[in-house]
From Swiss-Prot:
Summary of subunit composition and partner proteins: Part of the 50S ribosomal subunit. Contacts protein L32.
Designated name of the protein: Large ribosomal subunit protein bL17
NCBIfam families: L17 (TIGR00059)
Keywords, comma-separated and alphabetical: Ribonucleoprotein, Ribosomal protein
GO biological process: translation
PANTHER family: LARGE RIBOSOMAL SUBUNIT PROTEIN BL17M, RIBOSOMAL PROTEIN L17
Record-linked InterPro entries: Ribosomal_bL17, Ribosomal_bL17_CS, Ribosomal_bL17_sf
One Gene Ontology molecular-function label: structural constituent of ribosome
Cross-referenced Pfam families: Ribosomal_L17 (PF01196)
Homology family: Belongs to the bacterial ribosomal protein bL17 family.
Length: 120
């Protein structure tokens, strides 16, 4: 199984992908580098598939990966609740392909290719 190392140790890489996945679930659209977005895509697709399954085991598997951050301060809903109650039902009839990557220009400081990754 291949993956991108993203210039980090395995623990740092896992933490980065957890943070990005949680942010994408909360905001439904983030701007990041192309390599990070391509790695993030597979992680988020798996989380949404767990959300579609909806049983207790799937919820616990997703909770082990998604960070406990508040998604909506008015309702007190966290990222996991948003995944299972808002995002997963939206894709109930869709078999994969829940994200879209749109290319932007290069980043000003180092010229890294930037993209916007969003939920379809």
């Amino acid at each position: 199984m291949s993956y991108r190392k993203l210039g980090r140790t395995s623990a740092q890489r896992k933490a980065l992908l957890r943070d990005l996945a949680t942010d994408l679930i909360i905001n439904e659209r983030i701007e990041t580098t192309e390599a990070r977005a391509k790695e993030l895509r597979s992680v988020v697709e798996k989380m949404i598939t767990l959300g579609k399954r909806g049983d207790l085991h799937a919820r616990r598997q997703a909770a082990a990966f998604i960070r406990k951050e508040v998604a909506n301060s008015e309702t007190g809903q966290d990222a996991l609740q948003k995944l299972f109650s808002d995002i997963a039902p939206r894709y109930q009839d869709r078999q994969g392909g829940y994200t879209r990557i749109m290319k932007l220009g290069p980043r000003r400081g180092d010229g890294a290719p930037m993209v916007i990754i969003e939920l379809v």
